[in-house]
């Protein structure tokens, strides 16, 4: 991956990139650049479903207090939650047509809803999706 990613104007975060960022996994430095961009001029979003994933995964790794702090930091950084009321039909369409994991379907739905680029990790649920712009921050799973 490039040291300096080209940051789109609108970024939708899947859970994996944010878990990598907050848990200092490989690629966290790349995600930091995306978060910094959202704190600047870029628009950042996360599906409510993916936010729940971030919270419970960080909680399992670092505890409840840290997980709640992560959710607060995301809100303060300007990453806006996209609620399921806005995206459930889009997520259902992605799930029906491509069978990604449900969390990935909601991430795709959020990206379609805000016309943004979905930032994902190494999982292959989005590999053949062309209806939404997708950027991978890493190619190897952790």
Where are these regions (language model features)?
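Acidic, PIN/NYN-like endoribonuclease modules and their adjacent C-terminal/linker elements
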Residues: 1-5, 10, 80, 108, ...
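A general alpha-helix detector
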Residues: 53-54, 73, 90
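Active-site neighborhoods of divalent-metal-dependent phosphate/nucleic-acid chemistry enzymes
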Residues: 80-118
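Short beta-strand scaffold positions
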Residues: 13, 45-46, 82, 102, ...
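Alpha-helix capping/helix-boundary segments
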Residues: 17, 50, 86-87, 106-107, ...
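Short, well-structured N-terminal submotif of metal-dependent ribonuclease cores
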Residues: 1-46, 59-69
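Short glycine/serine- and small hydrophobic-enriched flexible loop segments
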Residues: 56-59, 112
């Amino acid at each position: 991956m490039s040291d300096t990613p080209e940051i789109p104007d609108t970024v939708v975060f899947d859970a994996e990139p944010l878990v990598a960022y907050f848990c200092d996994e490989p690629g966290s430095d790349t995600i930091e650049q995306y978060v910094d961009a959202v704190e600047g001029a870029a628009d950042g979003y996360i599906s409510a479903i993916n936010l729940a994933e971030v919270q419970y995964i960080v909680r399992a790794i670092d505890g409840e207090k840290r997980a709640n702090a992560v959710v607060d930091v995301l809100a303060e950084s300007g990453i806006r939650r996209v609620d399921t009321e806005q995206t459930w039909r889009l997520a259902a369409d992605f799930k029906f047509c491509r069978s990604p994991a449900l969390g990935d379907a909601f991430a795709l739905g959020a990206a379609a809803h805000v016309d943004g680029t979905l930032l994902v990790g190494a999982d292959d649920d989005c590999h053949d999706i062309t209806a939404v712009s997708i950027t991978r921050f890493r190619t190897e799973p952790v």
